[in-house]
Amino acid sequence: MFRRLILAAPLLVLVACGPADKPGAAKPVASPPAPAVVTRQAADGTVDRFTPYVGGPLMLDEFSVGPLMAQTEFSLEAIKPRFPKAKVDGAFSRIIVDQGDGILEIQSNPGTTRVGDIRITGGTPKGPRGEALRMRWADADLDYPRCWIGKDRDAHAVICTQPGEPVLRYVFSVPGWTQDTLPSEAILRERAILRGFIWRGGAPTQ
């Protein structure tokens, strides 16, 4: 009997200790908490509710640029809290959101107190189908008939839209192209690279 107890003792110790942690085993990292929804009163007395952008991909679609929507008031008071980590400055008809690695140029919507056109360059914007800066035109699943040559600051660039989505525009640079006419589809497939987005506020027209 005594001998059986001696043999059983080490087994009891092992059971009590349980399985040992493997050295160097990585422990799961907790995800950062999601930004809290912010509620403020707009200048016209309406309730302005949004989730601030604090990092990661800036999601774009027909209805919004991150926390900016067509109903967003065009004012520093409305835009600054939407981008708490960015430098936000401007006046009159344009507000600049400088995120360090990317810029949002926000125009006022003429005749209203709301945001209008928004130009997105740099940073980590992402379109509704995963479109990202530096993407090739050939990989963006765009239709050639929905593209046109840019003007003014977009001269020699090519601007495209997706079917039924006139608000979000894709701006492509075409290295070596200096003409004021639309390059052929073959040239776009070979050279065109996504350099930015334009989100048209108000009633978009080409």
Spans of features found by a protein language model:
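Surface-exposed, gly/pro-biased binding rims or lids
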Residues: 171-185
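Internal interaction segment
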Residues: 157, 165-173
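Short helix/turn-capping signatures at newly exposed starts of structured segments
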Residues: 18-154, 161-164, 181-206
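Residue-level signal for mature regions of secreted extracellular proteins and peptides
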Residues: 10-11, 153
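C-terminal motif of bacterial Sec signal peptides marking the signal peptidase cleavage site
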Residues: 13-16
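Bacterial N-terminal signal peptides that target proteins for export
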Residues: 1-7
